[in-house]
Amino acid sequence: MTAVLWLNLVGLSAEQIGEHTPHLAEWARQGSMAPMGGILPGVTCSAQATLLTGTLPRDHGAVANGWLDRRSMEVGLWRQSNHWVQGEKIYETARRRDPAFRCAKLFWWWNMGAAVDWSITPRPYYPADGRKIPAVYSWPPAYGQDLEQAIGPFPFFDFWGPKAGLPSSRWIAEA
């Protein structure tokens, strides 16, 4: 089986790959880059579910970054369970075709409960007092613990929002 590294680099276009991105430029020169079209809505959860299933939001069900629970009438934002996404994922197809297939799914959405060998994703805790405690979800559970022991805690507040930047990207690359 051929090894594949699939990088989901949101917002990166072919025009931005060059002198300041030497490793990506080398991969592109080797024929390892392919253009992809967008979908609507162009939001994280919908886009990643489309990439993973090859289907549109109307089919996989991830129509936004939030979900309305019709029983409670509450919106849950940024759900991470793989079970929210309907349809066969690319790694499920690969494993069906070759039972020896192995997959690591790092920092994609829909990681929790995904049928992969290793996964890790940001998963903060929100205690009743309103705090946000940075943490990661991983499978197997020791995987995230081992990574944090080896390379330090995940720089959660450098991953999202106004501080998003290189510290989290470096941590993910090291992982």
Residue ranges with predicted function:
Residues M1-Q16, E26-W27, L51, A94, ...:
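Beta-strand elements within well-structured catalytic alpha/beta cores of enzymes
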Residues E15-D59, A104:
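Short, structured active-site-proximal loop/turn typified by the sulfatase FGly-forming signature C/S-X-P-X-R
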Residues T55-A175:
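His/Asp/Glu-rich, glycine-adjacent segments
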Residues M1-T2, L40-V43, H83-E88:
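Short, exposed beta-strand "edge-strand" segments with a Pro/Gly-rich flavor and a Y/T-containing core
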Residues W6, T21-L24, M36, V75-L77, ...:
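N-terminal start-of-chain detector that recognizes signal peptides
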Residues G11-L12, G38, W108-N111:
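An acidic- and aromatic-residue-enriched active-site/binding cleft used to recognize and process polar
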